[in-house]
Amino acid sequence: MYILFFLIIIFLILFKLNWYYTNFEYYGLIIKNSHIPDFTRWILSDKFIAKEYAKLNGFDVPKTYQLVKFPHQIKFNYKNFVLKPTDLCDSAGVYLIKDNKNTLTNKVVDKQKIIQELQNLRSSIKTEYYMHEYMYNGLIPFSGYIVEELLLDENNNIPCDLKCYVFGGKLHYIAKTYNRRIINGEQKFDSIWLDRNWEPIKTKMIKKGYVYQEIKKPINYQKIVMLVENMGKILRRHCRIDIYVINDKIYLGEFTFFCGARIHTFICNYKLGKIWLDNPDDYHYEDKRLKKLVPNFYNIPN
């Protein structure tokens, strides 16, 4: 009898945990919602389309130098540039080149080595690099590469990025990410999270690299809030809007609908999940301007 009672308790606990991680916890909601067909999230996961759409909505964006299908088509004739796949996330295949050196490794650009690395990455892609392929039977807008302007701050350094978590058209959290570096082949970074009033969050929000501190608010912070919240209202979906602030200009980094929430702490994903459930997405709405931005060589779902 005691064994049966114990097994029932274990079953109920596991059932509740499974429900929580599937229907409430932030990362579970990301996975669950990634299977819902939605052209808006699907097409804006493409870095080129995201830039073009951001321009329509008041953001500055880096200049695009090239948009190509294959790595061997990339021209390495720029001193400073960013090279990245149009479709991948999680920093996969991203190269920040400054003065002909990779800023993360501090090594001189080796064209053939980069081409080979991109080809190897493309042949070993798994779901950690994107989730939007779940929506339309594995279809991706464009599996190519974009070469664009390298943004530098007033000190000629790579700027910190601000990851703005927007739900229901309202900014709830900002994660400032900085001090990116490579240690033993693994990318590391530091981060501090802030609320909408730019107050730092004492509770640890990511598992590694969380640094609680008071930081200076950007001079144009109210403009930042207005811009990202307006974007959230237009999207009518939860989105992490990544931006850079340089000389009072607000540049879009990317729209992130499927972020790497596995690096978040339990309490962080609990908070984000609750906010999301309180502010549900509207997957029926689509901005008619989006399809007009798509080049004719891109894929479009039927």
Model-derived features with residue positions:
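Phosphate-binding site of ATP-dependent enzymes
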Residues: 109-205
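Aromatic-acidic/polar surface patches that form glycan- and anion
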Residues: 39-47, 160, 217-224
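Short catalytic/ligand-binding loop motif for oxyanion handling, primarily in non-cytosolic enzymes
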Residues: 51, 72-74, 89-94, 103-106, ...
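A conserved helix-loop-beta module that forms one wall/lid of the active-site cleft
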Residues: 27-100, 104-107, 111-134
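Terminal signal-anchor or tail-anchor transmembrane helices
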Residues: 1-17
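C-terminal active-site "lid" helix and adjoining low-complexity regulatory extension at the edge
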Residues: 19-24, 245-302
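Generic beta-strand structural signal
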Residues: 76, 166-167, 245
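A long amphipathic alpha-helix within ATP-dependent nucleotide-binding catalytic cores
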Residues: 135-149, 187-250
